């Protein structure tokens, strides 16, 4: 479309608008003047201005009613409960021994040695038969003023004996001709019963003082390893030590006799693993390297099994004894050639010579190096006699001068064996001193102990007979 017509149409619209204005003006009434009338103002009405002015309205503050602020609610923070590690049970106290006394014992009396029986003419050749009690009582000899009684018989071969708090006699016993065995107990009427087992080659036994808890030495196996076991009153058997040296011979040289010392510790004798150290080597200073803990007496904490060497240089400490002052004694079975049977008075950290016996007549033994200091024997015992059990007399039945004397069983069937001998420790310094026979006529006496009534009780290995020696006065 041409531009001109658009412009022309616009002009026409403007002209129309102007015409309408003139029309309304012409139609107004004649003579009246048009006036603006003010809008009446409302009383107390607010006045509005172009820019509003803010007039603050005071709103009264609310009356504060105190509200108790609640105590903060403690939301526990979760802390994991600690894992309870049981505190170790307090170590049980060691029961120490009350020193024995001979108060009330008979007055001192001279003691003559036991006589010797005829060795022939019995029901079974050299000795009475096992069940010939009358024959045995005729054969067994004791000093004047004493007499022997038959107490009972253990089955099998007893090794060592001790009394319990119940007044009964307990023994380690080999069963059925083997090295296996158990603990047996002999009642007051002489009957026996099996108390605890099984053990391999059970040997020593000792009650912890003031308790019915029994400790037993034995082997772990027949040919290797020795140890100590605890037997609780309910029959539970628990190993205390199971790594001790063992076993030179089938029936010997293993963990042997047991005894509780005055300090409450348990002592055990441990035999050597050789006859005279021939399988050992020497260090540069000449000391023979024996296996750890062999040929020694060990001191054991009975509750934990911790132990150390108390004394050493003892080839085969078979049994231990304790006197009224707390001094320990040990028997020692010597070499297979017969040399070295002796009684020793033990001291802490002492060395008693084995295997350095070249200067004592053993040509196969080692020479003692200068670095080793040894203590002498208390008493030498007859060659090949094989001392086994030993006890210190601490009862009050025998005369007072026998208190703290030692009684030793000489086991072997040699001229000066098969008997119990008495040793007075106060007389041994006399160069002419010799042990005195106290019980003769036995076949294989293996152990001896003091009974609750103060008599001495000895047990024989072959038939298991138990004999009591009573003082008549």
Predicted regions and their residues:
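Short coil/turn segments that connect the beta-strands within blades of beta-propeller domains
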Residues: 166-167, 210-212, 263-264, 325-326, ...
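Residue position within the beta-strands of beta-propeller blades
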Residues: 170-172, 215-217, 267-269, 330-331, ...
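Beta-propeller domain segments
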Residues: 99-144, 272-308, 315-316, 320-436, ...
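Hydrophobic core register within WD40 beta-propeller blades
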Residues: 161, 205, 258, 317-320, ...
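Blade-loop segments of beta-propeller domains
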Residues: 181-210, 214
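Ser/Thr-rich, Proline-interspersed low-complexity disordered segments
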Residues: 27-118
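Surface loop/turn motifs at the tips and blade-to-blade linkers of beta-strand repeat domains
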Residues: 151-155, 194-199, 241-250, 309-313, ...
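Asp-box/WD-like beta-propeller blade repeats and closely related beta-sheet repeat scaffolds
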Residues: 201-202, 222-260
